[in-house]
From Swiss-Prot:
Documented EC number(s): 3.1.4.-
Induction data: Expressed in the late phase of the viral replicative cycle.
GO CC annotation: Holliday junction resolvase complex
Ranges of biased composition (kind: Polar residues): 354-369
Protein name: ERCC4 domain-containing protein EP364R
Function: Plays a role in the inhibition of type I interferon signaling pathway. Mechanistically, specifically interacts with 2',3'-cGAMP and cleaves it via its phosphodiesterase activity. In turn, prevents 2',3'-cGAMP interaction with host ER-resident STING1 leading to inhibition of downstream signaling pathway and type I interferon production.
Alphabetized UniProt keyword annotations: Host-virus interaction, Hydrolase, Inhibition of host innate immune response by virus, Inhibition of host interferon signaling pathway by virus, Interferon antiviral system evasion, Late protein, Viral immunoevasion
Any GO BP: double-strand break repair via break-induced replication
Alphabetized GO MF terms: 3'-flap endonuclease activity; crossover junction DNA endonuclease activity; DNA binding
Species assigned in the record: African swine fever virus (isolate Tick/South Africa/Pretoriuskop Pr4/1996)
Enzyme class: hydrolase
C-alpha cells in the first residue's frame, strides 16, 4: 500500500494536500489507493513509502528565503541526512524550491544573490544526484507531490486526472489571491471565513479582521490586515483588483464596471441591473451580460460551502451560475479561524459541514537502519 508521509510542521502545504488527496479519493479507480499521513519526520519534509519499512522517495521543500538562510547558517548540510537515508534505503531524493521562476540573477533573497542559490541547486543535481523541482507556491508544491506519489505507485503511472476543472473554492481562493500579499494559504482561510460582500459592506469590524490567524496560529501580516480594512472602507483600487479575480472579468473590465460606482452599489442591486451595464469597446458598446453578472454576484457572495447575501444575515444555498466550473464545493474551515459573520444556527451548521478529508492515524514505524 503506497502512502505519502508529511512532516507535521508543513503547515502551509498540508491543507492543499488534504484537498488534493480528497479529489483523488473521488476517482473510482484511485479511491482506495491515495493515503496521506501526518507525522514528525527527522529527515526531509515528505516521504513516499510503499510500506512502513520501504521508503521510495524523500522530499525536502524550501522557499527561496529558506534556501538562502540554509546557505548562510549551515542548514544546507541537512542534505547529509538525506544522503545517508539514500544509502540505507536506496530511495530517490528530491528538493522542491518554491518561489517565482527565474528572478534576476543579481536579485538579493535574504541577503543572498539568486545566482548563488542557482549554483547551490546545480550542485545538488550534479554532485549529489538529487532531483530539483521548482514550484510557484504552496498549492503548486502540493500538486507536484501528488504527481510524484502517483508516479511511484505502480498502478498510477501517467494517470491523467478525470477532471481538470477548478472547484468553486479554488476559484474563490484565486479571487482573494489577486490582492498583493495574499498567498494561497491566506486566500483559502479568507474564502472559508468571509465573503467579499461582507467585507465591502463593512460588516466585518476591524477588530474581527485583527483576529484572523494562519493554520499555524500566527496573526495575518499587518500589510494584509491594513488592506482588508481599506477594502471595507471602500478603496476603489483594491475593489477593482478583487473584482478582476472573478472568472472572465479581468482588470480592464473590472475598472470599467466600477468607473462610476463602488462595488457595494452593484452587490445591493439585482443581477439584472449589473447585467445591463454598458461596457465601452473600441468600436461599439456592449452589455456586461447575465452570465458575467451572475458570476460576479455568486463569487463575491461565496463563503465556504454557502452563498452569503449582503441584505440578509442568513446563509442560503445558491444555485451555480451557468459557467464551465465544477459543481462540487469543498470547504475546509481552518481550526485556528472561526467564521466572522453572524448566521442562523441551521445555516451555520450547514455551511461548516465538512466534506471530509481522509487522513490515516495509525502509527507507522519507518525502519531506516
Amino acid at each position: 500500500m503506497y502512502f505519502l508521509v508529511a512532516d507535521h510542521r508543513e503547515h502551509h502545504v498540508i491543507p492543499f494536500l488534504k484537498t488534493d488527496f480528497h479529489h483523488m479519493h473521488q476517482n473510482p479507480i484511485q479511491k482506495n489507493q491515495a493515503f496521506l499521513e501526518i507525522k514528525q519526520l527527522f529527515t526531509g519534509d515528505y516521504l513516499i513509502c510503499k510500506s512502513p519499512s520501504t521508503i521510495l522517495a524523500c522530499i525536502e521543500r524550501k522557499t527561496y528565503k529558506d534556501f538562502a538562510a540554509s546557505l548562510k547558517d549551515g542548514r544546507y548540510k541537512n542534505r547529509q541526512k538525506m544522503l545517508s537515508l539514500r544509502e540505507q534505503t536506496n530511495c530517490q531524493l528530491y528538493f522542491f524550491v518554491e518561489g517565482p521562476a527565474f528572478p534576476n540573477p543579481q536579485k538579493k533573497i535574504n541577503h543572498v544573490a539568486y545566482a548563488s542559490i542557482i549554483t547551490a541547486m546545480t550542485h545538488l543535481m550534479v554532485r549529489d544526484h538529487m532531483f530539483v523541482i521548482q514550484t510557484k507556491n504552496e498549492a503548486h508544491s502540493s500538486q507536484k507531490l501528488v504527481q510524484l506519489f502517483y508516479a511511484f505507485s505502480k498502478e498510477m503511472v501517467c494517470v491523467v486526472p478525470t477532471s481538470l476543472t477548478p472547484t468553486d473554492e479554488e476559484l474563490c481562493i484565486k479571487l482573494w489571491s489577486s490582492l498583493s500579499g495574499i498567498s494561497g494559504v491566506i486566500g483559502k482561510i479568507l474564502a472559508n471565513t468571509c465573503s467579499v460582500a461582507h467585507l465591502v459592506s463593512g460588516k466585518l469590524p476591524s477588530q474581527n479582521i485583527d483576529q484572523l490567524k494562519t493554520p499555524s496560529n500566527r496573526p495575518f501580516p499587518k500589510k494584509v490586515k491594513r488592506m482588508l480594512i481599506s477594502i471595507s472602507k471602500g478603496n476603489k483600487e483594491l475593489e477593482i483588483k478583487l473584482l478582476s479575480g472573478v472568472p472572465n472579468i479581468g482588470k480592464k473590465l473590472a475598472a470599467e464596471i466600477l468607473k462610476d460606482h463602488a462595488l457595494l452599489f452593484f452587490l445591493n442591486q439585482p443581477v439584472e441591473c449589473l447585467a445591463n451595464i454598458q461596457i465601452a469597446q473600441k468600436t461599439r458598446t456592449i452589455k456586461l451580460g447575465m452570465k458575467r453578472a451572475e458570476a460576479i454576484h455568486y463569487f463575491l457572495n461565496w463563503c465556504g460551502s454557502a452563498h452569503v447575501t449582503v441584505d440578509s444575515q442568513n446563509i442560503t444555498k445558491a444555485s451555480r451560475p451557468t459557467m464551465q466550473v465544477a459543481t462540487q464545493l469543498i470547504a475546509t474551515q481552518p481550526a485556528a479561524t472561526q467564521p466572522l459573520h453572524d448566521v442562523s444556527d441551521d445555516a451555520s451548521s450547514d455551511a461548516s459541514s465538512p466534506t471530509g478529508h481522509q487522513t490515516l492515524s495509525k502509527e507507522m514505524s519507518l525502519n531506516t537502519a
